[in-house]
């Protein structure tokens, strides 16, 4: 009985994701799971032609530069 219990505990530990990974938006609807060292979600705007802007989103290790950067550190916060 102890062997069965120990086996179940070991299988459970191996199946669990013991590390936390951040999830950020990459596009308007697409999401990406960040690498373990990337702890920031960002969103910033790049000027384009005719007064339009290009929105860039993703994961980073620090808040990037850009026009009006928005940086945060919780899941899907860069929307």
From Swiss-Prot:
Subcellular location: Secreted
Segments passing through the bilayer: none
Alphabetically ordered keywords of this record: Acetylcholine receptor inhibiting toxin, Disulfide bond, Ion channel impairing toxin, Neurotoxin, Postsynaptic neurotoxin, Secreted, Signal, Toxin
Tissues expressing the protein: Expressed by the venom gland.
InterPro entries to which the protein is assigned, alphabetical: Snake_3FTx, Snake_toxin-like_sf, Toxin_cobra-type
Signal peptide (residue range): 1-21
GO CC list: extracellular region
Entry GO MF terms: acetylcholine receptor inhibitor activity; ion channel regulator activity; toxin activity
Domain of life according to the entry: Eukaryota
Disulfides per UniProt: 24-41, 34-59, 63-71, 72-77
CDD domains: TFP_snake_toxin (cd00206)
Family per record: Belongs to the three-finger toxin family. Short-chain subfamily. Type III alpha-neurotoxin sub-subfamily.
Role summary: Binds with high affinity to muscle nicotinic acetylcholine receptor (nAChR) and hinders acetylcholine binding to the receptor, thereby impairing neuromuscular transmission. Causes muscle paralysis, spasms and increased respiration.
Name this polypeptide is given: Short neurotoxin 8
